[in-house]
Amino acid sequence: MRCSDLLLLFLLALCVLPGISCRNQEEKLLQDLMTNYNRHLRPALRGDQVIDVTLKLTLTNLISLNEREETLTTNVWIEMQWSDYRLRWDPDKYDDIQQLRVPSAMVWLPDIVLENNIDGTFEITLYTNVLVYPDGSIYWLPPAIYRSSCSIHVTYFPFDWQNCTMVFQSQTYSANEINLLLTVEEGQTIEWIFIDPEAFTENGEWAIKHRPARKIINSGRFTPDDIQYQQVIFYLIIQRKPLFYIINIIVPCVLISSMAVLVYFLPAKAGGQKCTVSINVLLAQTVFLFLIAQKVPETSQAVPLIGKYLTFLMVVTVVIVVNAVIVLNVSLRTPNTHSMSQRVRQVWLHLLPRYLGMHMPEEAPGPPQATRRRSSLGLMVKADEYMLWKARTELLFEKQKERDGLMKTVLEKIGRGLESNCAQDFCQSLEEASPEIRACVEACNHIANATREQNDFSSENEEWILVGRVIDRVCFFIMASLFVCGTIGIFLMAHFNQAPALPFPGDPKTYLPP
């Protein structure tokens, strides 16, 4: 048993000792590399040596673009590579160790920062370990969530596209000390933002059209005599997906605004109801305009396309309210206040209705006749007016109850003459009834004249109402045409506002992987 235990311990030692030896070699290698190593000094053999630093940006998520704050939020991986001659070793001396993981705080870093950040976070979010290789090359892949500034052009909102940039530069070193380069893989320069299909999460509001990358030296702020200034700029040209705004703002706004045009189908005299509907539509449009104002930046450089459309609809609605007031004013005119000229009658009652497809009532030929039947109550009212106009002495009757029954008295007197079967009695009865007959004739003439005047008054009233209807129909065609043409014209402007086919005008390169 003792021999077997010793054999087992020997075998375990053979399995464990290589791992211990390897781990000790990594520790020894790290200790040897960090001896007399100063992370604050640039890894250059000579003072004029320029250190090459390659960059590659991998986009994992386009989180959001806040138009109001003009902020682009992205989740990226920044791949950086450079060479440090102080971190070289011979793998044969350290059990063939081919790479070493070292905390990034222990080695020299090129201090690459995002220049156009908006929240003051210039540096990397998480300082991960760097990979060091025997030839002294260093590979660093830290993750970061950046909030960069992005100038928003709201002219065609919500059918717009934006060109956002992420500008990287060294915070400490100029182009005379380090050389920022784009990564080269398989002999090809990666002149674009790399997107890993497996790790990338597509944004629901924005579609990426172009993602080129460029290096810029000595931008307009510096002259060649100054210390060389270099940047690596990654561009994100993105197109908005407008479906959300079409469904939730544009379509409801168009439907509500079309109700303002439908008020022309109300009667011409219903001006109050027309104004009520139009003002309610105007209030709804104001609410939509307020919602848009909460979304876009507070800028006076341009007016959003949807803001222009809502303003256009508000102007149309206000014009409809003005039209309703004018039509109501015309429809309620009377001969006592306005007289219609022949030119107005010819244009608005004969000429325009033919072109507008309106059926106007035809005038009856011959002498004017009463077009409506009058009730007996109306005749009695006219008789009362006549009695008030005549002197009291001429309206004395035998009985007060017969004051409103002139014909009854006349017929009773004539009837007594007929009952006597005597011509002399009949003539005498006619002579007795003659004052009442004259009064009846005068009353009938007064009623006929008053009825004729009332018919003429009503006829001219109806003519003004017809003029109001014609004005209403003309305004309907104008406003409907303006509404349709304006809607189509404004949104056709959005249709032609597409992201460019190439990222840079005049440059035929697509800056995309082959």
UniProtKB/Swiss-Prot annotation:
Protein's UniProt name: Acetylcholine receptor subunit gamma
Catalytic activity: K(+)(in) = K(+)(out); Na(+)(in) = Na(+)(out)
GO molecular function annotations of the record: acetylcholine receptor activity; acetylcholine-gated monoatomic cation-selective channel activity; transmitter-gated monoatomic ion channel activity involved in regulation of postsynaptic membrane potential
Cytoplasmic side: 331-473
Membrane topology per record: Multi-pass membrane protein
Keyword Cytoplasm set for record: no
NCBIfam families from the UniProt entry: LIC
Transmembrane spans: 242-266, 275-293, 309-330, 474-494
Name of the gene: CHRNG
Keyword terms of this UniProt record: Cell membrane, Disulfide bond, Glycoprotein, Ion channel, Ion transport, Ligand-gated ion channel, Membrane, Phosphoprotein, Postsynaptic cell membrane, Receptor, Signal, Synapse, Transmembrane, Transmembrane helix, Transport
A Pfam family: Neur_chan_memb
Paired cysteines (S-S): C150-C164
Extracellular-facing ranges: 23-241
Superkingdom as given in the UniProt entry: Eukaryota
GO biological process, one term: acetylcholine receptor signaling pathway
Subunit comment: Pentamer of two alpha chains, and one each of the beta, delta, and gamma chains.
